[in-house]
Amino acid sequence: MAIVNVNRFLKEVESTDLKIDAISSSELYKDATFFKPDVLNCIKRFESNVKVSSRSGDGLVLSDFKLLDDTEIDSIRKKSNKYKYLHYGVILVGIKAMLPNFRGMEGRVIVYDGACLDPKRGHICSYLFKFESDCCYFGLRPEHCLSTTDANLAKRFRFRVDFDCPQYEQDTELFALDIGVAYRCVNSARFLETKTGDSGWASQAISGCEALKFNEEIKMAILDRRSPLFLEEGAPNVHIEKRLFRGDKVRRSRSISAKRGPNSRVQEKRGFRSLSARIERFGKNEFGRRASASEAPPGRSISMEDSHRPGKGTSDGSSP
């Protein structure tokens, strides 16, 4: 099941304020039509825009990253007395290279359930991205719903992103990462079919991406939830689009800077292996396709909330 028409998406995505706006609501839900403004108004959109800076030539790793911020989670929980379930119509991931000679560079994105203690069962999907143009995209449409009253709702979709980083001066912004989501709250799964009648799991490599199977390397990456990049979040952005005969279209986004933090050197001494080390060991043509338990470092399962508490000079990328 294809989530988007690739040619139409690639044409639209560069002309929208948010990447997630390149996917229309009518593509996600069959009842999202012009004649049902209430349905269109209940489909919410949120996007995180992350600028990733270099770390003195080391490989870059962004781990345990939240799909939604606290403001969005609070808004969903306030609707729990009216709606029982939360459904993600689509999650869109875009990676943009902002450096010369980017063609052939690659990396990996792992999406997983941060509340699941079993990495294999909690693994949602993984993609290898390789720059043939300056942007790579993939999308996924989960089959399952989540509870609006789930105490661990913020943990249910987490991301780990590994970048192959060339040698640059520290804090040079090299990559832009856009993670957007369109979702709705419902009381019945019968409202979740697309306009083609599909309601099952879907994952699509839109441009420059290739799906990866779960393996030992991905397992160890999920277990190692330390983030050597310091996340610095700016003020949230509200995007309002005026519409005739219907309510205004309101979307939220957040801008985040990911760079080397004050504790990065300490984390490296604890055994963190950069992406550059993995690529050198396995070879670029094997990245993400091969795993060796004997070569993988012991994983530590710690949450961003524990390692980034106030007073330690870190942030988890969500609103205060």
Swiss-Prot record:
Entry superkingdom: Viruses
InterPro entries referenced in this protein's UniProt entry, alphabetically: Trichovirus_mp (IPR001815), Viral_movement (IPR028919)
Protein name: Probable movement protein
Function according to Swiss-Prot or TrEMBL: May play a role in virus cell to cell movement by increasing the size exclusion limit of plasmodesmata and forming a complex with viral RNA to assist its movement. May also have a papain-like protease activity and cleave the genome polyprotein.
Chain spans, region Disordered: 251-270, 286-320
Keywords, ordered alphabetically: Hydrolase, RNA-binding, Transport, Viral movement protein
This protein's record includes keyword Transport: yes
Organism: Apple stem grooving virus (strain P-209) (ASGV)
Origin organism lineage: Viruses, Riboviria, Orthornavirae, Kitrinoviricota, Alsuviricetes
Pfam families per the UniProt record, alphabetical: MP
GO molecular function terms noted in the UniProt entry: RNA binding; serine-type endopeptidase activity
Keyword RNA-binding: yes
